[in-house]
Amino acid sequence: MMKVLVVVALLVTLISYSSSEGIDDLEADELLSLMANEQTRKECIPKHHECTSNKHGCCRGNFFKYKCQCTTVVTQDGEQTERCFCGTPPHHKAAELVVGFGRKIFG
């Protein structure tokens, strides 16, 4: 009977150790994933900043990703250049306004 208890205790110890190692590995993977997401968040272009060279690199806003909006600028020399900035398109602004108004009403 004593041998059975020792074997059971040994098995329980091994199982708990292996499951804790698995949890540690899972936590490490989650941490790496969060760090990678934070890195991409830092690399995105904030609202109202220039995105001429990277038109798909705008950050996310409250509800939608900002869009790179471009305009043609004419210099005093008559040269036309394209300038772009990250901003919220009008239809996204309208949707955010409706959602904000709905939150105020329905709380």
UniProtKB/Swiss-Prot annotation:
- Localization in the cell: Secreted
Question: Domain of life of the organism in this record?
Answer: Eukaryota
Name the InterPro entries for this protein. Spider_toxin_CSTX_knottin (IPR019553), Spider_toxin_CSTX_Knottin_CS (IPR011142)
**Where expressed (tissues)?**
Expressed by the venom gland.
User: Using the chain's own numbering, where are the disulfide bonds?
Assistant: C44-C59, C51-C68, C58-C86, C70-C84
Residues in coiled coil: none
> Signal peptide location in the record?
1-20
GO CC, sorted alphabetically, is: extracellular region
Propeptide found at: 21-41
List the keywords (alphabetical): Disulfide bond, Knottin, Secreted, Signal, Toxin
- GO molecular function terms listed in the Swiss-Prot or TrEMBL record: toxin activity
Q: Does the keyword Disulfide bond apply?
A: yes
Please tell me whether the keyword Secreted is annotated for this protein.
yes
Family designation: Belongs to the neurotoxin 19 (CSTX) family. 04 (U1-Lctx) subfamily.
**Domain comment as written in the entry:** The presence of a 'disulfide through disulfide knot' structurally defines this protein as a knottin.
Query: What is the name of this protein?
Result: U1-lycotoxin-Ls1d
Q: Which organism is it from?
A: Lycosa singoriensis
Q: What is the lineage of its organism?
A: Eukaryota, Metazoa, Ecdysozoa, Arthropoda, Chelicerata
